[in-house]
């Protein structure tokens, strides 16, 4: 085409676009809100939640919570097919009309007494090949409803590197739009809308200087520096306090050594503190990846670790603020994943000597902590004679070491009934044996994720998969959920890529075996703010990044505390009646080939939570 014909072609393009009412420039077209229990995919334009949901009536976000609780919601910004430039979301602190007090006033300290507001951009990971029903869900009948597409996962702080989630962010054109624009003469059809989620954490006050009652604020959406949408925000602060102490446990493993590799500017001690602080703020015990958990007993090492179990590490004086302030970790694993079994506890004499030392230290320094010897991981029948021998060395110990509980990741097995003190089943919990085990001072936990019995731990899981496990724990009186890994940034050694670091921001696959068993997102609930191995993915932050999965783990833990408070007021039966309206069955009451019996909608949990709050009274 000659240059003289370009103006005519351009004019025809403009007229055609105007007739179709399609913008010729990138633009935000709308914004709406949804709770923390949903995942809105990037190209999902048919969600009924857009019109109304548990926190959104079409114009206002309404939240309700307790002192010391963290509330969360998402702002979904819709852009046309051309995308949008320089988009960001800001939250004006909600103000109490009578007192003028504000929740989340800007400024330090983080998670301070008056509350804090944090806003993150949501990073999407594309899944083309779904996780197979191996360890993650029992059968196709229990699979998540949507398993492919651009799934929101990582939550990126505003001060991240430009172009890597830092504010403001550009919403790129849809892939279809890019293809169309390769030919300048092609008429642009109606643009495909796309979503960009922003996550908001609202930390409610820790003290009573902010009065209970209604607080009002606004959420603003900016595009290229101008306001393009406003959403009203109302927060009702109830006159009750969410305990700092957790009455149920999430045990998450995270490797200090691996994390330290990604943050070369930090010392090992700084990397460990970063891991501990971030997990503690989400009401999780990140235990097992420190030197204290993988080494033989060492008095000096345990004295260095002691602040994490007595709570002094989680105080403002130690640099910590937020939920769980002053509360220590509730769990400690001796020799995580069997790391000292064949070293310090390889024969009878050394096992008795080592177990004596551990028991004496904990009884003197941390008597409230549940400590145990992680003897072996996921044993099969061939290891049973070996387990009996090693467990006998502990249980027959004439010294204090006989009180060291023996732990393994296996569902209760009659043949080992006298040998194992704490079980963690990957297929659930033997509910028939649980009362008897507890009466003997033993226990049975559940391990990782297994739909339909409890939530899956894969990227394609619903947001509430990580929330429902706390409800299952309360329903059946299970104390602990153990998740095998939260910082699985290097491929597992059982597979062909064990020597490689993962592209956790772009590749969904995080677990692969030699037999090509796939798992998307397994083992990753925390993400690295630095990426020395793939610099193009580096966010430029010397701290950990959260995820929607991590936030729903916290939401579940907070739900459990509300259940605990409600039980003190109204009794367990009334609490169970509300829980069963959402989670009628779980664990081994559900066959692995059944559909999921519990709700997969965040709204249902929110409405049940509202009823639980009602039991607390005014």
Predicted segments, located by residue:
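Extended acidic/polar, glycine-enriched regions
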Residues: 64, 76-95, 185-247
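Bacterial N-terminal signal peptides
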Residues: 9-23
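Conserved, mostly hydrophobic/aromatic
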Residues: 75, 219, 373, 473
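Catalytic domains of carbohydrate-active enzymes that cleave complex glycans
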Residues: 317, 324, 336-347, 351-382, ...
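The substrate-binding groove and active-site-proximal loops of carbohydrate-active enzymes
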Residues: 205-209, 256-267, 290, 294-296, ...
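Surface-exposed binding patches on compact interaction domains or structured appendages
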Residues: 27-54, 81-201, 206-208
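Catalytic-core region of carbohydrate-active enzymes that cleave or remodel glycosidic bonds
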Residues: 417-518
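An acidic-aromatic substrate-binding cleft motif
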Residues: 228-341, 363-372
């Amino acid at each position: 085409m000659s240059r003289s014909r370009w103006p005519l072609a351009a004019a025809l393009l403009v007229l055609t676009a105007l007739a179709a009412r399609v913008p010729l420039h990138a633009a935000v077209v709308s914004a709406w809100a949804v709770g923390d229990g949903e995942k809105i995919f990037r190209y999902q334009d048919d969600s009924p939640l857009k019109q109304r949901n548990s926190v959104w009536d079409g114009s206002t976000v309404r939240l309700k919570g307790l002192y010391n609780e963290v509330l969360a919601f998402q702002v979904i910004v819709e852009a046309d097919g051309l995308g949008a430039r320089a988009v960001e979301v800001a939250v004006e602190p909600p103000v109490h009309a009578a007192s003028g007090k504000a929740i989340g006033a800007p400024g330090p300290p983080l998670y301070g007494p008056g509350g804090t507001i944090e806003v993150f951009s949501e990073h999407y990971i594309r899944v083309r090949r779904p996780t197979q029903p191996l360890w993650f869900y029992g059968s196709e009948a229990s699979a998540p409803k949507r398993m492919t597409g651009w799934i929101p996962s990582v939550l990126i702080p505003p001060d991240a590197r430009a172009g890597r989630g830092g504010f403001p962010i550009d919403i790129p054109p849809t892939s279809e739009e890019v293809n169309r624009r390769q030919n300048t003469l092609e008429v642009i059809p109606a643009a495909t809308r796309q979503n960009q989620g922003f996550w908001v954490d609202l930390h409610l006050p820790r003290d009573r200087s902010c009065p209970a009652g209604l607080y009002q604020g606004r959420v603003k959406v900016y595009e290229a520096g101008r306001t393009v949408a406003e959403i009203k925000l109302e927060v009702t602060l109830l006159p009750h306090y969410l305990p700092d102490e957790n009455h149920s446990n999430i045990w998450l493993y995270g490797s200090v050594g691996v994390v330290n590799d990604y943050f070369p500017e930090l010392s090992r001690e700084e990397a460990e503190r970063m891991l501990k602080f971030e997990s503690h703020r989400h009401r999780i015990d990140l235990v097992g990846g420190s030197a204290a958990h993988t080494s033989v007993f060492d008095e000096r090492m345990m004295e260095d670790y002691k602040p994490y179990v007595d709570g002094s590490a989680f105080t403002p004086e130690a640099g910590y603020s937020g939920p769980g302030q002053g509360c220590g970790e509730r769990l400690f694993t001796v020799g995580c994943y069997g790391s000292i079994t064949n070293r310090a506890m390889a024969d009878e004499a050394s096992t008795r000597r080592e177990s004596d030392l551990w028991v004496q230290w904990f009884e003197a320094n941390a008597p409230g902590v549940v400590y145990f010897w992680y003897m072996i991981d996921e044993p099969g029948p061939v290891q049973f004679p070996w387990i009996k021998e090693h467990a006998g060395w502990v249980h027959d110990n004439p010294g204090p070491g006989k009180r060291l509980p023996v732990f393994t990741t296996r569902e209760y097995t009659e043949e080992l009934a006298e040998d194992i003190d704490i079980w963690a089943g990957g297929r659930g919990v033997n509910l028939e044996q649980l009362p008897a085990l507890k009466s003997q001072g033993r226990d049975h936990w559940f391990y990782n994720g297994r739909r339909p019995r409890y939530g899956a731990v894969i990227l394609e899981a619903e947001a509430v998969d990580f929330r429902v496990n706390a409800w299952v724990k309360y329903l059946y009186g299970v104390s602990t959920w153990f998740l095998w890994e939260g910082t699985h940034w290097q491929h597992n050694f059982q597979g062909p890529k064990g020597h490689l670091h993962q592209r956790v921001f772009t590749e969904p696959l995080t677990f692969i075996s030699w037999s090509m068993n796939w798992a998307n997102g397994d083992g990753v609930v925390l993400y690295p703010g630095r990426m020395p191995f793939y610099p193009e993915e580096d966010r430029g932050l010397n701290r950990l990044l959260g995820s929607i999965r991590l936030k729903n783990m916290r939401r579940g833990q907070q739900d459990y505390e509300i259940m605990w408070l409600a039980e003190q007021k109204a009794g367990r039966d009334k609490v169970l009646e509300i829980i069963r309206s959402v989670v009628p069955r779980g664990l081994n009451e559900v066959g692995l080939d059944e559909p999921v019996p519990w709700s997969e909608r965040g709204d249902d949990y929110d409405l049940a939570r509202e009823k639980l709050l009602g039991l607390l009274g005014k």
